[in-house]
Amino acid sequence: FKRIENRLVGGDDYHGTDGPLYLTTADCDNPLFDTLFAAAKEAGYPLTDDVNGYQQEGFGPFDRTTWRGRRWNAARAYLHPVMKRPNLTVQCGVMVNRIIFEGRRAVGVEIRRKGRTSIVPGDEIICCGGAINSPQLLQLSGIGDPERLEPLGIDMVQSLPMVGEN
């Protein structure tokens, strides 16, 4: 995480300052937070100055990815700066059904848009569907546990039984 962070209050052993994702610490200097932290302490919870630092358990100021009053997300940090690259295609309103392989090499994706299925070739395929959809997409593409995929008629590309188990 250190490499992605640009923590505006400075870096330390747990936070970076050179990454593209702006990170600010919430201003907790108000009666609501004072009351919340006092109640947490009274209930036996630890207090911490940095919930993403050494002592993660407990209550304390939280970091947020904001910059100049706007949420600063992964799209703003990574995608928007490279949108004009000739080797990048971003399509919205598209469902990716599976990754197309030739042997073990990804050569495209099968997509569905407005009820129509088509194949989009690509020299580089980036699987970035998050914690749920990335393993699902890999499994639908034949990467995963053969005991699960073969009964569904999915041709195996690579036996990796732990895909989807995290």
Language-model features: locations:
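Conserved redox-cofactor binding core of oxidoreductases
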Residues: 1-106, 110-112
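Glycine-rich loop(s) and the adjacent beta-strand/alpha-helix scaffold that form part
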Residues: 99, 108-166
